């Protein structure tokens, strides 16, 4: 299973030639990143409807039938805040499994898991989790969560990366400082291949740009309405 980080909380997850994309972002609201355009995938997953996570227009789906999907995908509803959703509602954690590999994308999780949810997410091969923010769990709570769930590979996401990402997010070092230094592995690439026997680690991937945009169909232009609506700030939560 290959996991590629496209910035913020967006990843592609590929297995046996089939690709999921999760949480595509609108660059008007996740500043510093280039605009997502024409990211190719076979299936789209979204943790919650905010512009930092739901930019469907940036994804081109293949149209392959569900029967082609090699993944078992289990969504779990969690709170996006510490007050039972009063401030930010809920979001989805996605448990993604294929050929014995278990990975999870925790979205903007903002509160502890239930016992049942924790049981389903225990001892994952890979966990994509926020590095800490005021709109999700802070870094100290993320560390406690990973200590409880014991994932083999922790992939930080949703953090301030240089001049990329919302300023209110924490930097990745605010999370990695809680772990032994020899556990933290800084990658020179934006992707990692997950296996059942890889060494435990905090895998900090490096943003390396976005996939090239596919060429537009000859003579086809976006309508004025679609161009305007893509910029309208209906929902600003990240």
Residue ranges and their predicted role:
Residues 4-6, 87-88, 153-238:
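Binuclear metal-ion centers of metallo-dependent hydrolases, dominated by the metallo-beta-lactamase
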Residues 10-46, 50-64, 74-89, 109-120:
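Pre-active-site segment of Zn-dependent metallo-hydrolases
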Residues 18, 149-153:
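A short helix->loop->beta-strand "cap" motif at the edges of active sites that frequently abuts
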Residues 42, 125, 152:
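Conserved acidic residues
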Residues 52-100, 180-199:
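Metallo-beta-lactamase
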Residues 83-149:
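Active-site-proximal loop/helix segments of hydrolase catalytic cores
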């Amino acid at each position: 299973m290959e996991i590629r980080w496209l910035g913020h909380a967006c990843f592609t997850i590929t297995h046996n030639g089939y690709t999921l994309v999760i949480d595509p972002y609108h660059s008007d609201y996740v500043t510093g990143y280039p605009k997502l355009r024409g990211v190719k995938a076979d299936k789209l997953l979204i943790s919650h409807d905010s512009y930092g996570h739901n930019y469907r227009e940036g994804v081109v789906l293949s149209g392959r039938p569900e029967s082609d999907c090699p993944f078992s995908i289990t969504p779990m509803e969690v709170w996006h805040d510490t007050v039972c959703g009063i401030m930010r509602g809920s979001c989805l954690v996605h448990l993604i499994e294929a050929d014995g590999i278990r990975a999870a994308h925790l979205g903007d999780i903002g509160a502890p898991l239930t016992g049942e949810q924790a049981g389903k997410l225990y001892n994952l091969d890979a966990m994509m989790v926020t590095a800490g923010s005021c709109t999700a769990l802070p870094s100290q709570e993320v560390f406690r969560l990973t200590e409880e769930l014991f994932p083999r590979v922790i992939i930080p996401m949703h953090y301030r990366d240089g001049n990329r990402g919302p300023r209110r997010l924490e930097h990745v070092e605010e999370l990695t400082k809680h772990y032994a230094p020899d556990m933290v592995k800084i990658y020179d690439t934006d992707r990692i291949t997950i296996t059942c026997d890889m060494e435990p680690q905090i895998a900090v991937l490096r943003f390396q740009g976005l996939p090239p945009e596919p060429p537009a169909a000859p003579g086809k232009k976006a309508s004025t309405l679609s161009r305007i609506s893509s910029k309208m700030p209906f929902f600003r939560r990240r």
